[in-house]
Amino acid sequence: KGSALVYDIKRITEKKPVDNAYDALKELPGVVEMNGQLTLGGQGATVILDGQVTNLTKEQLTQVLKSVPKDRLADVEIMYNAPAKYNVRGACININFLHETAQEQRLTGEVFGVYDQSHDAAFQERASLVYAGKKMSIDFMYSHDHGNSYKTTETDSHHSLSDGNVYDISTYQRSRTRGHNHQMRLSMGYNFAENHNLNVTYYGSYAPGHTKQETTGSINSKYGIDTDPWTHDIAADYKMPFGTNIGAEYTFYKAPQTQTQSSILTDGSLDYISNSRQKLNIWKVYVKQDHTLKNGWGLNYGATYSTSSDNSYQNYLSTVNRPQDLPDNISASKRENIVNIYAGFNKNFNNKLIIDASLAAEYYNNPSWNEWNWLPTVNATWIPSQGHILQFGFSSYSTYPEYWAVQNFTSYNNGGYGVIVGNPDLKPMREYSAQLTYVLKNKYVFRGWFTHTDDLFMQTLYQQPDVLRETFKVMNFDFQQQAGLMAAVPLKLGKWYSANLTALGVWLRQKDSDFYDIPFDRDIVYGMFTLRNDFHISSQPEITLSVNGMVRTKALQADYDLPASGNVDAALQIKFLKNKRATLKLYCADIFETAQINPYINFKGQRLDMDMSSYRHFGVSFSYAFGNYKEKEHKKVDTSRFLK
């Protein structure tokens, strides 16, 4: 389908032990979960819904996908190089949901529950209802996640000061978190005629939580944080039969926090209460136009305007009657504007060669930066014969930092030894990417790519030379370069066994010539391999055993070294009752407790070792569908730049 590879997700997952949209996506060739996020062919990917990007963060989008039953997915479009009309950056996964109407009014639904046990227990309850009429469809979903979590972090820091003194600071931190996450979505659609429809969607979440940390060793500390974030998002999308698409979206996000800390450090003490809040108002409007012309030509153009206001504050109050060097109280208000205007064309040469090219002009404005960028995207797809697809893509795009990262705020971790500071001078990063993808027999996928990213930003750690403090700060590097090869190969033995093997090899280089007083230019070659196995034990009732594994070799990130890691998961799914309405799943994740990466630093006098806990998860889930339940879905909000 043009520059997209379209997958029948229902057929791919119908006998696999997955029960939500997020896990269903991991069954697609080349889609791999890394650090809790979905990647495509070894690179980060943007997930969009029904062709539209939203204001939800990646973390919120992940939670939404995990609460959506897999049966609501119609198909999935994989784009290694998304055209400008999608207004996304680089690789893209477009989920198309079922939006059904019916000649007779119909109400269907599903109830779902899961119990998950690691060190502590967690739960989820979910209910979905879908109404289908002749013209109107209404879709409602509510989910409630709640429970406790526990983790430990052991840190050994060999801290050298400029006066020649060296301090060994060893800490052991225990963290306990309890909380709730309520999510609700209501989507209403009305079909006036073919290719003429209006959809309005509301999404809301409320996730109060409390975390308590205790640190012992060289530092003794008690720390607590209460969070109370709210999200409201409403979006409207109107498609007209002559190719016009207009829409608008509004997002409100409010995240108040209260922190308390009492610490005895190697060189002093720290006692305070801190109150902070991030409040965002984000508006977006867009208009798009597609023309289908003669002789296989197509033309598209459009514009998107988004504006956001960030009104945030942070206050510190000492809890002892002695002088302390606490951060200043700060209240900040910032506005950001982004304008994206694009035009593109496509040409189909007898279903053998398909060209899709576009050029976007993007304007970015905030109190620190004011700039225009030209963002070209080119895709050329050659189909020499049935079952063979060769695709070349080139693109350039910009990525913007989180709102909180560009505020001049300060907070603490590890009992006050770690100081997290903002960076108002952060610049957007600009990536240039080229890739070549070959699909053999419509199932084997081979891919090679190269990317160059100017002003790459990420959070770094630095041991200060004049004081016993570690500074965590999001900084711009000179550049990052990546070159990689990926192969995704499906395997099958009769009707009883099927599998997907994904092999990935990457060369990575990162350079920062002004990283404090220790500039770096580091590179490494690493590999990652995943194997997803499904054993089909019985058809009546339908019983499937899934055993999945992943291993990743040593990698790096700035001055960090990332040791090898991996995990093995298993799940047993049973579908029973009439029309397989009931589904029972038993699972165990991270069986050998090896998934956690324990980073360390040993670079130009900086030395740090971390050992973080990793607990296996086992649990059981049950779902029951009623009323010939088939699902549909709505779109999501990009909250990737909100405070987490």
What are these regions (language model features)?
Residues G113-H119, G133, H144-N148, G204-P208, ...:
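Transmembrane beta-strands of outer-membrane beta-barrel pores
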Residues Y22-T57, K85, I93:
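Extracytoplasmic beta-strand/coil segments of soluble accessory domains associated
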Residues S398-G448, H452, E470-G484, V489-K492, ...:
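Outer-membrane beta-barrel signature, preferentially recognizing the C-terminal barrel domain
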Residues T54-Y80:
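Short acidic/polar hinge/loop motifs at secondary-structure boundaries
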